[in-house]
From Swiss-Prot:
MF term (GO), any: protein transmembrane transporter activity
Gene coding for it: tatE
Family indicated by similarity: Belongs to the TatA/E family. TatE subfamily.
Protein name: Probable Sec-independent protein translocase protein TatE
One Pfam entry name: TatA_B_E
GO cellular component, one term: TAT protein transport complex
Bilayer disposition of the protein: Single-pass membrane protein
Sections of the chain in a coiled coil: none
Coarse class of the protein's main subcellular location: membrane
Any one GO biological process: protein transport by the Tat complex
Keywords: Cell inner membrane, Cell membrane, Membrane, Protein transport, Translocation, Transmembrane, Transmembrane helix, Transport
Length: 67
């Protein structure tokens, strides 16, 4: 009852293609791929940008505890 079989998935895929058309789905897939690619690039740029200033900063002074 709760299982999703291959035939059910094929029927759903056929309905989606009939409703939206192949051109709309192709455009949607391309937009989604570009969004994911842009997100990954932004994450990598953010990581490299965060590491660069820290490496160029002078080391902090060492504090010693005096009793």
């Amino acid at each position: 009852m709760g299982e999703i079989s291959i035939t059910k998935l094929l029927v759903i895929a056929a309905l989606v293609v009939l409703l939206f058309g192949t051109k709309k789905l192709r455009t949607l897939g391309g937009d989604l791929g570009a969004a994911i690619k842009g997100f990954k690039k932004a994450m990598n740029d953010d990581d490299t940008g965060a590491k660069t200033p820290a490496a160029s900063e002078a080391p902090a002074e060492r504090l010693s505890h005096k009793e």
